């Protein structure tokens, strides 16, 4: 189950936390959440600085009502924070037991390699998964990212596998969402 701190301002994590408490045990499922986008106003409200990562993991764990995440995914690469700072902070979360594994999302293959190189060079935790935009309408990841992940034995977990709903209906059908969704209008029309 993948949620993110920013989805519905944390409500997705709260709903999942309640569902897990009522219907399953954390040991029976794999829980993943993402970090990057702003959760409040302020200079440290977003991104992948050490301060932002540490603040958001505590909030995520509180909302999920658990002591750890199985997989903590960076929602985007933060180009305003040094990669070394981000990778060290993520490694420290693993060392602290708050996170079992780390993953990445939505970056270029060369950026992903750079993150992995920095982690390996310093003996830190490396990413075990890559989540990029991929579906029957948008297949760019087949060019570089997928071959890289296969070679490095990194799990691939696509997002928007139904192209924001475009693959669930006849091509060209308009919905209220498709009229206003920037991602749909950018990638799938």
List each model region and its residues:
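A short, structured active-site edge motif that brings together acidic residues
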Residues: 27-40, 130-132
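Active-site mouth loops of central-metabolism enzymes
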Residues: 39-54, 75-81
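Beta/alpha (TIM)-barrel catalytic core signal, keyed to glycine-rich beta->alpha loops juxtaposed to Asp/Glu
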Residues: 83-189
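N-terminal binding-site loop/beta-alpha segment at the start of enzyme catalytic domains
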Residues: 2-30, 67, 95
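Short, acidic/polar
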Residues: 46-65, 112-117
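Active-site groove signature of glycoside hydrolases
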Residues: 61-82
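Active-site-proximal loop/turn and secondary-structure-junction residues that shape catalytic pockets
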Residues: 5-7, 35-37, 75-78, 106-108, ...
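Glycine-centered flexible beta-alpha turn that most often forms the glycine-rich phosphate-binding loop
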Residues: 1, 69, 102
């Amino acid at each position: 189950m993948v949620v993110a701190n920013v989805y519905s301002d944390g409500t997705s994590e709260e709903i999942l936390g309640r569902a897990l408490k009522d219907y399953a045990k954390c040991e029976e499922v794999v829980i993943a959440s993402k970090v990057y986008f702003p959760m409040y106003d302020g200079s440290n409200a977003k991104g992948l600085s050490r301060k932002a990562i540490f603040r958001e993991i505590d909030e995520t764990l509180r909302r999920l009502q658990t002591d750890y995440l199985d997989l903590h995914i960076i929602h985007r690469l933060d180009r305003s924070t040094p990669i070394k700072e981000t990778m060290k902070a993520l490694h420290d979360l693993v060392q602290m037991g708050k996170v079992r594994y780390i993953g990445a999302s939505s970056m270029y293959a060369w950026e992903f390699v750079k993150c992995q190189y920095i982690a390996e060079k310093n003996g830190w935790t490396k990413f075990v998964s890559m989540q990029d935009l991929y579906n029957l309408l948008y297949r760019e990841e087949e060019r570089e990212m997928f071959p890289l992940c296969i070679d490095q034995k990194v799990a691939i977990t696509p997002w928007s596998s139904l192209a924001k709903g475009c693959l669930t209906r006849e091509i060209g059908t308009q919905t209220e969402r498709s009229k206003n969704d920037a991602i749909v209008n950018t990638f799938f029309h």
